[in-house]
Each structure stands twice: as structure tokens, then as C-alpha cells.
UniProtKB/Swiss-Prot annotation:
Binding site for NAD(+): 56-60, 104-105, 139, 162, 198, 314, 338
HAMAP family per the UniProt record, alphabetical: DNA_ligase_A (MF_01588)
Name the record gives this protein: DNA ligase
Residues annotated for Zn(2+) binding in this entry: 429, 432, 445, 451
InterPro entries linked: BRCT_dom, BRCT_dom_sf, DisA/LigA_HHH, DNA_ligase, DNA_ligase_AS, DNA_ligase_CS, DNAligase_adenylation, DNAligase_N
One of the GO biological process terms: DNA replication
Keywords: DNA damage, DNA repair, DNA replication, Ligase, Magnesium, Manganese, Metal-binding, NAD, Zinc
Keyword Cytoplasm tagged: no
Similarity section: Belongs to the NAD-dependent DNA ligase family. LigA subfamily.
Gene3D superfamilies: 5' to 3' exonuclease, C-terminal subdomain, BRCT domain, DNA ligase/mRNA capping enzyme, Helix hairpin bin, Nucleic acid-binding proteins
Active site residues according to the UniProt entry: 141
Length: 691
């Protein structure tokens, strides 16, 4: 996408807009069109090139200005960037017919089948009198959901899932929310165009989104493909808009009569019109080069931020493809050379229940140990009773265990039922016998901290790095303290004596003294750490920091109303109510009061909040003693901005061990100052920011 000319909102945009009420309709219309053009360009730079040219704050102001103008002067449009936030919920997804059949592709993991495919092509083309070159286009086989995107006069008019290949679900409203799918096309595009793409959720985004779901007390998705599938078929587009979907376009279904000679020419045209394409796509001279391409992609698979399960080999020349045609099921000119499956079979030996710190019961399958993708697996989470029923899994069953990408292994299906026992979900907690409470598919123990399992998990969380980071108070130590009756409530930690701890198995006086010193050091924690340590459902380290910045002291947080909490950035109406409910609980108030009586006094939120205001940081490489997330939090809680890519708006590139070459080259290109970790820490200290 070329940079628009004479558009004032591209680089260093003026943000001191004149009041909307002072604009006439003609001026407002011109500004709306200029803003739309600029925002589309900024979306392209950010989402497809990962190289923004303005700050996030400037982008937000341009976006908000466009929203106000469209609302004030009734200039809304289905192709406006503002429409990506999602429309009204649907009653159901309609079924629509595809412009062209979306056929399956023959596939195999055997190299002999790939060579046979090439032989068939050579023989059929020779029989048809074809004398042109036989070259192949190779591309990754994405593990997502195929969609058909239809554009009329350069504007997205429809999006549909693959369905049965002839018709699929109309998911236009949801696809409009995906930033990498252009609502309007660039350049000399056909007046009518239908393309095929793959919707997916990037691996890093999947892990982060699952972490957020867990913090909110929601069920995590089992793998990126399921996350993308469930998101794309949402009836409420606003839900889709909140989830990090992405899209690659890889095929033209109808080019409006353009008649491209090769698939590589199609690939280049698609990119020029503004679609995101995968940059690994390559044209090769023969089938052996295609086989080598597959091996390269297999070797580099782990480094990709999206799931692939093989490559697709396509005949490059379109006239040759036309000669070969297709069967009812698949084209004769394409073949998928898949990777070896990351699936293994094993036997379920038992199903047990784990009780978490919130009281939630999670069934876990105990398995005969099996290696999956180089990792020995002997346990797999079954999530809830509903999943057990859907899988139909029981003790003694032979099951397939799958590890998609880098996610936690999960049971995919029952292969052979040799059931020794049927698993019945109980009505009472297996640990403390308290009644269970159901919330949809989830079950919770009502015993609270009187339940030893909940107490153990609560203490572990309190002492974890996400809490107060109390060294020496890990899972085994907590188990010993609870089993010995030394800790029956969270505040009991601060009643421990050296003599009591030293008598425990494996402990001595020195290790006991070290633990008590750690506990003493934890009595003046930063407020964000204390809030996170309490284990408030839905409140992780980031949300805790947001709350602390807003209210400043523990008393102010405890006194905050649900409405006041909902007003904090990043906290919606549901979470705001849950936080208020947590602090309204007599049980939780008593725990906090008992902690205070034992000397635990959280420090008010730091007042260095604006010390880094206006400064943008990018990090590359690993930092000693500091995760990337923690580094970002240090910057953002001090008023600065932390982004993932270097641009002209970046002030500092912080370079750790094994840094990325691309970011360093971009820093040189843009004249960005580079800092070592030591330089970065000195900069923070100079602003009074504690690390």
C-alpha cells in the first residue's frame, strides 16, 4: 500500500482539531474522507508491516475524531475503519453460496505420493500437448479457517466460511472487525473480486488471550484453531472485535476477467491490492525443490507466530491448471504435503479432580506416559464435566493426545473404548466434602479457605511472582505448612516461628530463618503486587497496576464502588462488579484486616506515574531478571509507551541478550537511541522509578 500524498494525518499529524460544532457539512465530509484514508494506511503499517509511523496515542485521537465526525454529520459507512468495532448481534448465521467452489486439496505425509503427483501432472500435460514450463508455487498450509472474501467496486461486500465447499456461513460482520482484512482495496483492483484466505489466531496472541481469560475466570481455548473457529462464528461481532484474529489471503477465486498467467502473478497482485500475504510463498522449478521447501518450513515451523501443518504445492501456470481441471472434490493441479502429526495414542488410567484457589474443580486425566513433540505427557486437563461428556471419555479408554504448536497437550478423541470405570462428577468437594455450586459448565467448592486445597493454592498464589514473590514459599513448602497445621488461614504465614518451621522435614534453622526474613520483607509490598496477591478473580498483575494507579491506596480501593471500578481503563462492567463484590465480602475483609494486624501494610501506588510521559520504548532480546511483560509494565506504569516494533516515533530501543537484527537495523534507520539494560535501569532510577 503506497503512502497517501498530501494527507496531513500520515506523519506527525496535527491533533489540535477545531471543534466539531464549528464545521460545516462540506468541511466535515472532506475531513472524514481524509481521516479514513489515513487510518487505513496506519492499519496497514501496524498490522501488516509491524512498522507504525505514528504513536498509539496519536492513532487513537485520529480514530476518535473520525467517530465523532461520522456521528455528528451522519457520515457512517460500512467500509469505514470505525465499523471494525462490531455491529449488532445476530440471531443466527445465514448460509450463502460461494462465488466459486472452495474445494479440498489432496494431501499426504509421504514423499512418494508427492513425486507421484508430479508424475501425473507431467503425463497429463504431455498428453494434452502442453509444452510450457512445469513449475510450482509453494506456500505454507495454514491451520486455521478458510474463508471467501468478496469485493465489489473495491469494497468488502461479503465474507463466508468454507462450509461444504459449495456454501458456507455468512460471517461478514465478524470479518469486518479483523484489522488485516481490508474493507476497501488499493490500486487497480477488479470491479468484482473473490479471494480465498485463512483466518487464524497468532500463537503469541493466543497465549496472551488465554491468560486474560484465566484471569477473568473464563475457560481457556484448547488451541489457536479452536479459538479462531469459535470467534469467527460468534453471533455478536463486538465479541469478535475484542479477540486477536488475523488473516492471510492466498488464492483468487474470481478475478473479474483479469486472466493472470501465473499464480505468482496472482500472489503479487493480491498483495498490491492491500491484502496480507505470507512472505514465505515461493516459486520453484521442480518437485524436488518443492520437497526441499517443505523440509525448510518444517525446520522453521516453531519460529512462526502462526500454526501450519504442511505446505501446499500448486502448479504455477494458470493455462496448465485449466488443462488439468478438477474432480468433484479437489483440483488436479494442487497437493498438500503435510507435516508428521503431533498426535499420539495413550490410555486413560484415572480421572481425578483438582481444586483451584477460587474453588473451581477441574477434572484431569491421568495417562500412560507418552512423548508428544518431544515432551513426555502423563496428564491432560479435561476442563469441565461438559467436555468429558462431549468426548465420551472414561477410565481405561484409548485416546489420541494432541499437541498443536506450543500449547498444552489435550485429549482430541476416544479411539477405542475399553472402559474399566465410568467417571461420575461428584456433588461434593473431594477434598473437604463441602457442597459444590454450579455455574454453567463449571463447578465450584463452597468451602472457601476452610478447604485445604483452596488454602494451598491461595497461599501459593500469594507467594508467587504474580503476588509478593516470597522466595522459599513454593508448592512443597506450602504443602508442608498446611499439612502440619501451621497455616490454616493466609494471615497465619506471619505467625510462623523459626522453631516451628525448622522442625519440618528437610528444613533446618538456617532455611527457616531465611523464610521468615522473606516474610518480613513482604510486609511492605507495592500496592499493585498486594492486589494481585489477593487472588481477586479476573485481576492479574496488569489490572492490579491499573487499579493501584487509579486509587492510590488500599483503603481507597476497598471503598471504591462498582461504578468507580468500571471507569478504570481495561475494566469492564462485569469485572468491576466482581472486584467490588470481593472487597464487600466479610470473609475477604477479615483476611485483609488480619494481615494488617500482623504488620502487612501495602505501600501507596508510586507517584512517578508521568515520569516517562511522551517517551516510547521498544525491547529486543532477553533482559536479566526482568521479563518482557515486566519491562513493559515498568514503562507503562510510569506514563511511557512500550511497543513491539521500532518506528520514527520510538525514543529508545533497549537491547538485551540475543537481540533481534531487524529491530536494531530499524533503530539505525530511524536514528533511535539504543540502551543497554544497565542504561535502561539507570534511566528509570534517575526518574525515581524503582525496579
Amino acid at each position: 500500500m503506497e503512502e497517501p500524498e498530501d494527507n496531513p494525518y500520515i506523519r506527525d499529524p496535527p491533533l489540535d482539531f477545531e471543534p466539531v460544532d464549528e464545521l460545516d457539512a462540506a468541511s466535515a465530509t472532506r475531513q472524514v474522507e481524509t481521516l479514513r484514508e489515513a487510518i487505513r494506511f496506519h492499519d496497514y503499517r501496524y498490522y501488516q508491516l509491524a512498522d507504525p509511523v505514528i504513536s498509539d496515542r496519536a492513532y487513537d485521537q485520529l480514530f476518535e475524531r473520525l467517530e465523532r465526525l461520522e456521528s455528528k454529520f451522519d457520515r457512517s459507512s460500512a467500509t469505514s475503519p470505525t465499523q471494525r468495532v462490531g455491529g449488532e448481534p445476530l440471531d443466527e448465521l445465514e448460509t450463502v453460496e460461494h462465488v466459486a467452489p472452495m474445494r479440498s486439496i489432496e494431501s499426504s505425509v509421504e514423499v512418494d505420493d508427492i513425486r507421484d503427483f508430479d508424475t501425473r501432472i507431467q503425463e497429463r500435460l504431455a498428453a494434452a500437448g502442453y509444452e510450457g514450463p512445469v513449475r510450482y508455487l509453494c506456500e505454507p498450509k495454514f491451520d486455521g479457517l478458510s474463508v471467501e472474501l468478496v469485493y465489489e467496486e473495491g469494497e468488502l461486500s461479503r465474507a463466508a466460511t468454507r462450509g461444504d465447499g459449495q456454501e458456507g456461513d455468512d460471517v461478514t460482520a465478524n470479518v469486518r472487525t479483523i484489522r488485516s482484512v481490508p474493507l476497501t482495496l488499493d490500486g487497480d483492483c477488479p470491479s468484482f473480486l473473490a479471494v480465498r484466505g485463512e483466518i487464524f489466531m497468532p500463537k503469541d496472541a493466543f497465549q496472551e488471550y488465554n491468560r486474560e481469560r484465566l484471569e477473568r475466570g473464563e475457560e481457556p481455548f484448547s488451541n489457536p484453531r479452536n479459538a479462531a473457529a469459535g470467534t469467527l462464528r460468534q453471533l455478536d461481532p463486538s465479541v469478535t472485535a475484542e479477540r486477536p484474529l488475523d488473516c492471510f489471503v492466498f488464492d483468487i477465486l474470481d478475478d473479474g476477467g483479469r486472466g493472470f498467467e501465473t499464480r505468482m502473478a496472482e500472489h503479487e497482485a493480491v498483495e498490491s491490492w492491500g491484502f496480507q500475504v505470507d512472505d514465505h510463498t515461493a516459486r520453484v522449478d521442480d518437485i524436488e525443490a518443492a520437497i526441499a521447501f517443505r523440509e525448510e518450513m518444517l525446520d522453521g515451523r516453531a519460529s512462526l507466530d502462526y500454526e501450519i501443518d504442511g505446505i501446499v504445492i500448486k502448479l504455477d501456470r494458470k493455462d496448465a491448471c485449466a488443462l488439468l481441471g478438477a474432480t468433484a472434490r479437489a483440483p488436479r493441479w494442487a497437493y498438500a504435503y503435510k507435516f508428521p502429526a503431533r498426535t499420539e495414542e495413550t490410555t486413560v488410567r484415572d480421572i481425578v479432580l483438582q481444586v483451584g484457589r477460587t474453588g473451581r474443580l477441574t477434572p484431569v486425566a491421568l495417562l500412560d506416559p507418552v512423548e508428544v513433540s518431544g515432551v513426555e505427557v502423563s496428564r491432560a486437563t479435561l476442563h469441565n464435566p461438559q467436555q468429558i461428556a462431549e468426548l465420551g471419555v472414561g477410565i481405561g479408554d484409548r485416546v489420541t493426545l494432541k499437541r498443536a504448536g506450543d500449547v498444552i497437550p489435550y485429549i482430541e478423541a476416544v479411539v477405542d473404548s475399553e472402559r474399566e470405570a465410568h467417571f461420575e462428577f461428584p456433588d461434593r468437594c473431594p477434598v473437604c466434602e463441602s457442597p459444590l455450586e454450579r455455574d454453567g459448565p463449571l463447578a465450584y467448592c463452597t468451602g472457601g479457605v476452610a478447604c485445604p486445597a483452596q488454602l494451598r493454592r491461595a497461599v501459593e498464589h500469594y507467594a508467587s511472582r504474580s503476588g509478593l514473590d516470597i522466595e522459599g514459599l513454593g508448592e512443597s513448602a506450602v504443602d508442608q505448612l498446611v499439612d502440619a497445621g501451621l497455616v490454616e488461614r493466609l494471615p497465619d504465614l506471619y505467625d510462623l516461628s523459626v522453631a516451628d518451621v525448622a522442625e519440618l522435614d528437610g528444613w533446618g534453622r538456617t532455611s527457616a530463618e531465611n523464610l521468615l526474613e522473606e516474610l518480613e520483607a513482604s510486609t511492605e509490598p507495592p500496592l499493585p503486587a498486594f492486589l494481585s496477591a489477593l487472588g481477586i478473580p479476573g485481576v492479574g498483575t496488569t489490572t492490579a497496576a491499573d487499579i493501584a494507579r487509579e486509587f492510590g491506596t488500599l483503603d481507597a480501593v476497598m471503598d471504591a464502588t462498582a461504578e468507580e471500578l468500571r471507569a478504570v481503563d481495561g475494566i469492564g462492567p462485569t469485572l468491576g462488579g466482581e472486584i467490588a463484590e470481593f472487597f464487600d465480602s466479610d470473609r475477604n475483609q477479615q483476611v485483609i484486616e488480619q494481615l494488617r494486624k500482623r504488620g502487612v501494610d501495602p505501600e501507596p501506588a508510586e507517584t512517578a506515574g508521568d515520569a516517562l510521559s511522551g517517551q516510547t520504548f521498544v525491547f529486543t532480546g532477553s533482559l536479566d531478571g526482568l521479563t518482557r511483560e515486566e519491562a513493559h509494565e515498568l514503562v507503562e506504569t510510569s506514563g511511557g509507551t512500550a511497543t513491539g516494533s521500532v518506528s520514527g516515533n520510538t525514543d529508545y530501543l533497549v537491547v538485551g541478550d540475543s537481540p533481534g537484527q531487524r529491530k536494531r537495523e530499524a533503530a539505525n534507520e530511524h536514528g533511535v537511541e539504543t540502551l543497554s539494560q544497565s542504561d535502561f535501569e539507570s534511566l528509570l532510577e534517575s526518574h525515581g522509578i524503582e525496579i
